Amino acid sequence: MKPILGITMGDPSGNGPEISVKALMKPETYEVCRPLIVGDAKCMEAAIPTVKGAESMKINVIHGVKEAKFEPGIIDVYDLDVVDLSKRLYKKDRKKLAEIMQADVLDAAYKESMTMCGEAAFQYVKKAIELAMAGEVDATVTNALNKDHINMAGHHYSGHTEIYADYTHTAKYSMMLAPVSYTH
C-alpha cells in the first residue's frame, strides 16, 4: 500500500498552499503516495484559483485520517481551522495598504496577521508530528514556515528541525543541506 504523507501547509501568508495545490493537481503524485495536507481548509480553498489549471480541484475537509479519500482532483485537508482569512495579510500587500492606512494601524494589523500565521504554521507541524508518532501517517513533508512568525507567536525555534526534535524527544539531531534544482 502507498504511504500516507502528512504534508504541512506551511505559513498561511506564504506560498505553501499554492505549492501544495500544484503538487496535488498532478495525478502522478497519487501514483506514489497518499497525500494529506495538514493545515487550514479555507486557506487551501483560497489557493486553488491562484494556480493555473487547478480550477476543478476540490477540498475534502477532514478531522481524522480515515476520512481521507486520496483521489486525484481532491485535496484532503486535515483542517485545524486556526486562520482568520479576514486578518491574513501578505508582505506584498503592505505597500498597497500603506496608502490607505495609518502606519501604526497597519503595523498592528501586520503584527497580528504574522503572529496568527506563525501560530498556524507551528500547529500544522505539531499536528503532523502527532499523526506520525501515532502511526496515522507514514511520513511527514513540510512546506516553508517563517521563523520570525513562529517566534512572534511565542514558539522559539530556529526551524522545523528543532520543532521535530522537541516533539519527538530527540536529543541528538542535525539538518542536512544539499543543492536544490527546480524544474517547472
List PLM regions with ranges.
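Short, acidic/small-residue loops that bind anionic groups at enzyme active sites
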Residues: 152-180
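Contiguous, glycine/small-aliphatic-enriched amphipathic segments in soluble metabolic enzymes
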Residues: 1-161
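Conserved small/polar residues in nucleotide/adenosyl-binding loops
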Residues: 183-184
